[in-house]
Amino acid sequence: MPRIAYLGPQGTFTESALLQMISGAMVPGGDADDTAVTPVPTDSTPAGLEAVRSGAADYACVPIENSIEGSVLPTLDSLAVGAPLQIFAELTLAVSFSIVVRPDHDGDVGTVAAFPVAAAQVRRWLAEHLPAAQLVPAHSNAAAAADVAGGRADAGISTALAAERYGLRSLAAGVVDEPNARTRFVLVGRPAPPPARTGADRTSVALRLPNTPGALVAAMTELSIRDIDLTRIESRPTRTELGTYVFFLDCVGHLEDDAVAEALKALHRRCEDVRYLGSWPTGTAAGAPPPSSDEATRWLTRLREGLPTPPEGGR
């Protein structure tokens, strides 16, 4: 029975994403029955990843990117250091919030409990409807609901699920500044063989480059000359020395795609360190797939065997 850490307490978007991963049979070693999985709530995303490293959990469901604020930096920073971890699945969740109050609340809202990531996604709504309210930081969206239930805030930015579990009333539902807000969650575990190639896959690595002119361009060239579609590049400080960075790269394709495998080998030769973060299915194609090397392989095989090769136009 897999143990899966997630940002708790119950009622967070992360829990909702985890439940959908379970029902979609996306958990290695699990099935679509949520009773076959043991949820392990944690106080933060880094704590969930550390639970996997320590063996207290088999996997962690964590947010990695949202369409409003971009990458979830605590997740990236935690993946870049410590014992290596690997991504096995992803799920994108539509996000909107509920402004929750206690059932007996009838008055002004002076304080609003909010997870900082959530507050950033409803900034305009708050400025319009609760301009005088003071934000009170919470550890998660569900923790914001708990703060309201405990009387530590007049209202909270939370989820409908958390409101139901804490017996709160919704002052406003479906609140979000951008109607197409989405958050991408990933399932992270200790290193293991990746899920099978599906043809709609994503591969992610974190690179440490030598401090030499053109090092980043040289690394990117290894992808471009193989026609690999790079979908994300982002840098984060190493926190060890000023001016040194870790570069996170996402590309379309799987470790079992020849072009991706060759690019990773080339990066391994060029970079000070290549941390493989996984190859996993995305469900839908998110860019141009890497080119097949079948024809080139057949051509090379004929050369090695001393057989005639057709002219370029006769393939």
From Swiss-Prot:
It is an enzyme of class 4 (lyase). Pfam families: ACT, PDT. One of its GO terms (cellular component) is cytoplasm. It catalyses: prephenate + H(+) = 3-phenylpyruvate + CO2 + H2O. Keywords: Amino-acid biosynthesis, Aromatic amino acid biosynthesis, Lyase, Phenylalanine biosynthesis. Residues 3-190 form the Prephenate dehydratase domain. Residues 204-281 form the ACT domain. GO terms for biological process: L-phenylalanine biosynthetic process. Homodimer. NCBIfam families: PRK11898.1 (NF008865). This is Prephenate dehydratase. It comes from Mycobacterium sp. (strain KMS). The lineage of its organism: Bacteria, Bacillati, Actinomycetota, Actinomycetes, Mycobacteriales.
